[in-house]
Amino acid sequence: MGVLFGLRDNQRVMRIVLIVCCFFIFFGFLVHPRVPSLSDTWHTTAKHDQRKPLVKPEDVIVSGLIFYGRKSRVSSMRCYLERNLVDNGGWLDEVLWIVNTENKDDLSFLDEVIANNPKRHKKVIAQERLWAHTYWKAWRHLERGKYYVKIDDDILWIDDDAIPNMVTRKIRNPETFVVSGNIINNPPLGFMHYRMGALHPYFPEPEEPTYVTNGTEYWKPSQHGFWDGPSSFTWDIERKPPQYKNHRWLRVEDERMIYQTPVAKLKYEIWETSYEAWSIATQMHYSLLENIENDSLDLYKFDKPWTMYEDRIRINFMCVYADDILDSDIEHWPKNRGDEDMIVLDLPKDLRRRRLSSQSPLPLLTVGSAAVVIEGNALAAHFQYMDQKGLGGTDLLKRYRALAEDRYCLPNGGPSKQ
């Protein structure tokens, strides 16, 4: 009998142990998503981030700096500039337009923009057409003590908090030379966006449609239906675009087919295919429109700055402090170097050398990372590089214009209703 009672007691203890173990396992599953790993050094921004809006310091002057040439692009960008003016609750005290065109229609459009708010918009007419090795002349117009947000004229979309986030990062980190935005269609960021899950499967529609929706929601991918084709279909990135004008790319319903789409060829590279392929850029743009529609911009964002060290980043959308540029003796920049070469490669490298030789009190890691960083929460979309000519045959310019009118343009240029 004693043996039997002993067995029962052992069984009772085993049951209690099993119950306790199950409880802790279950509790662990509940808690784990809420407790980040101590070794986790990279955190994407949570969806519906509830951080308080950034407040512009009273003693800070922020100027937009735009190298202007094309009405077809700026007709969309104009809405985002208006949203970001201090008059409308934004951070831009002024916008400086560097005119680099002789086209009468383009010039007339810019005059219209400036006339709408001459207090905030200023025009500088270059004495000659500027190109890669003469853009340095535009940087002479910076004024000391100001922060400048340089915006290419084919930036077609700017997230509402992008400029505040870039400028704040620069203010808080004065040793950083350049703060770049997290830009759609700016290698090598496309590779990162792909690996972070921000890009989706799209293919060009197989033939010209007989009817296309043309309402205010034209920009939304959901309004155009799914792509219809064989599951084995692929699109060679060297393939030319469809021949008809304003062709569409449509969402592929099967997510698994993304491996057959152009973005599957993305690499962490500055030039080559990731830079040249119009089809990759096209797919990135349509993916952005989908993410805006689905309120999924968190897919692109990250909190820790991405340091470029001595890698190039294109200067499509970035923040600099005027004194940092003016102290570099712009007039004597090497004549065989473009402004991008100087601002994101040569000047930061020289700055690091000077700090190291002067025995700067800054930690070595900070000195090494003082060059160029990506602000992961400053999203913007850059339309096109010269090698991406096929983009012009898509309906993307039309879609970005529809997006601006539907979501971002202020009524009569008035204050934001946010």
PLM regions with names:
Residues 62-71:
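A conserved hydrophobic helix/loop-capping motif in glycosyltransferases and polysaccharide synthases
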Residues 97-150, 156-164:
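Active-site-proximal specificity loops/subdomain of glycosyltransferases
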Residues 46-51, 70-88:
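Short, well-formed alpha-helical segments that are part of the catalytic scaffolds
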Residues 3-45, 56-58, 77, 232-418:
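C-terminal catalytic/acceptor-binding lobe
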Residues 66, 93-96, 111-112, 116-122, ...:
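Long, low-complexity intrinsically disordered regions enriched in Ser/Thr/Pro/Gly
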Residues 58-62, 85-96:
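Short loop->beta transition adjacent to catalytic acidic/histidine clusters or analogous donor-positioning motifs
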Residues 145, 156, 160-172, 228, ...:
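Short alpha-helix within the catalytic core of nucleotide-sugar-dependent glycosyltransferases
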Residues 158-211:
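Conserved donor-nucleotide/metal-binding helix-loop-beta segment in metal-dependent transferases, i.e.
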